[in-house]
Amino acid sequence: LPVAAILLLVLLIAGFSVRYISFVSQTIYQESTSHLEEVLHKSNNMLKEMVRKNLTYLHLYNDFLENTSDEAEIQAYIEAAQQDTGFVGFYFLSYDGNYMTVTGETGYLGLQANLDEKLSKGEDIVMNTALPGKPQMLAFICPETQGSYRGFAYDAVAISYYNDAVLRLLDSSAFEGNASNYVIYPDGRVVID
């Protein structure tokens, strides 16, 4: 009888231990999931706000460009806007990705996708880009205004930020800087890493 009682006691302790470990594991999982959802929600809201704000700026710049043709005035306006908002570059952009800056610099803005289709729909665009020898950037593109600047025919205007600046904005103190950040499209393509 004492052996059966000890065996029963051991089985009860083992059963309670398994239930307790299961309970603790589930609690930790729920807390971790809740915290991660909170962090991701915060980052998502900050990214949405950044996109909304920068596309609004682009629409304001378009209004200015529609009413002004003086190159010096345009350059002064864009330089002041750059100081106020902190974007890296402002581009007059053609449908094929070629650009001209307000200072007259030309080149190809290495975009991840074909602009032609999106510009023809008149949609605002946010996409990853890179210039030779420079870090990756996030470009905000607005096709609202078409025109010519210094003889360069453009189909849209764009501003860009270096990805590290965008990630600093999105960085949360939740992981004390020990996390990797990715911004992805719904189809899984990485926008910022």
What residue ranges belong to the model's regions?
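Extreme N-terminal signal-anchor transmembrane helix of membrane signaling/transducer proteins, especially
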Residues: L1-Q26, Q30
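Histidine kinase transmitter module recognition
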Residues: I13, M46-M50, S173
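Nuclease catalytic cores
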Residues: T33
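Extracellular/periplasmic ligand-binding regions of membrane signal-transduction receptors
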Residues: E37, H41-K42, M46-Q75, F92-T106
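A generic secondary-structure signal
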Residues: K42, M46, F64, A80-A81, ...
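Short, hydrophobic-rich beta-strand element in sensory/regulatory alpha-beta domains
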Residues: L58, F87-L93, A179-Y182
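Solvent-exposed, extracytoplasmic
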Residues: E71-T85, A156-D193
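Extracytoplasmic/periplasmic ligand-binding sensor regions of membrane-associated signaling proteins
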Residues: D84-G86, F90, Y95-A165, L169-S172
